[in-house]
């Protein structure tokens, strides 16, 4: 069933699954405010729930260690800034996805902590949060609007995901200011990896979550629950920094996929 990123549809789908008396539900529902409502439906029906990426009360969480993923990206961004960016007139910009709630926002918290841990001089930099809704278009518009009024000469940017990172990058390219920035993404999604392969890109990295491996791992957790074996309240995936230098090593099949894709 597809929730279509729509809280009303998510609730209707939950009602259907409860009526069907399923044995277990694996739920990807991204609106934090609806999570208690959806979780309560399953709890009242005694249906165990695995919540993917966004916590639901009483559910087993499966997904990112958001703070750790943020630290990985932030430390890399801090190392880059230390080598390339003097701190004067540098602004830190963090592109958020507010509706996903507090846990995904910990990616941004981790990035900010990681940057300053590696490069303490950034303690004095201005920090701005922009709402990009995790989407390229909205992040492009938010960044485009911001740089019109910002007095910063350089930008160090941490994004909640790769579409947001790319939206910020496209806005800076449009303004002719891409050389004044360094951008860190999250997810190492296909579009992010494609940008990492672009010569001279200012997307200096992204943190991989490897969703292509989720299926087998989630099924293993589901079977443990159904067989009443002990399961931790949260099962975290492993993260890895992906950069222009190692993207082909970590994702060697990307070029093969592109080479065999049909042209339209």
Show the residue positions of the predicted features.
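Hinge/beta->alpha junction and helix N-cap segments in small-molecule ligand-binding domains
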Residues: 1-10, 31, 63-73, 94-114, ...
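Hydrophobic alpha-helical
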Residues: 11-19, 23-44, 111, 128-195
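Short, hydrophobic alpha-helical segments
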Residues: 18, 77-82, 147, 218-230
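Flexible loop/hinge segments that line or gate small-molecule binding clefts
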Residues: 32-68, 91, 189-198
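Structural detector of well-ordered beta-strand residues that form the stable sheet scaffold
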Residues: 50, 158, 182-184, 207, ...
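Short acidic capping loops at alpha-helix termini that bridge into adjacent secondary structure
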Residues: 88-91, 123-125, 179-182
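Hinge/cleft segment of the Venus flytrap/periplasmic-binding protein
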Residues: 103, 115, 210-264
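Rossmann-fold dehydrogenase core element
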Residues: 199-208
